[in-house]
Amino acid sequence: MIIAGHDTSTALLAWIFALLGQHPETHAHVVSEVNSKDRSPLLDHIIKESLRLYPPIHIGNRRVAENMEFAEGTVPAGERMFYSIYLTHRDPSVWENADDFCPERFAHGRKTPPMSYIPFGGGPRACIGAAFGQAEARIVMARLLQTFSFEPMKAAKIHAHMGATLEPRPGVMMKVLRIPPNF
């Protein structure tokens, strides 16, 4: 579980920085929010939207409860079936502008159909570390954004590599500078 938490957290943080690098207005807005005394709802929305677009664990599986009939054949009860969390999160019948980075979609407590937002799986076997992972991302991102400035180094096309986790490739290259402390 420690390894799973490490790799998924790393992938999530990398995707957040990749997305903020592509959306400088959102980046500037979240930096302003984390530096204010108030709670930053935008950071939570950015984390949720990053998890929607690029869920670190991009495939899930379920045991089929009853026979499932398809035009191509039958999946018998008891078999394991894999599903794509990545594609579920990009379903245009659920998500308006499904491929666009839009943290504001989480701003108003928008309800989605059951099992349409499942970055940590769902049901009784959902990831035990979900709350910890989101809290960790929030704390780490807030501290990094308060302490350093981040600028994309080059406009290299980043693509999603589907390995054990969904990772940005060739990586996220950023110029990182320490922000002088205000005393």
Residue ranges and their predicted role:
Residues K37-A71, P92:
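Conserved cytochrome P450 K-helix E-x-x-R motif and the immediately C-terminal K′/meander segment
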Residues N67, Y83-R110:
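Conserved cytochrome P450 K-helix/beta-meander segment immediately N-terminal to the heme-binding cysteine loop
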Residues M1-L13, H27, D44, R63, ...:
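Conserved cytochrome P450 catalytic core segment spanning the I/J/K helices
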Residues A126, A131-F183:
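Cytochrome P450 proximal C-terminal region
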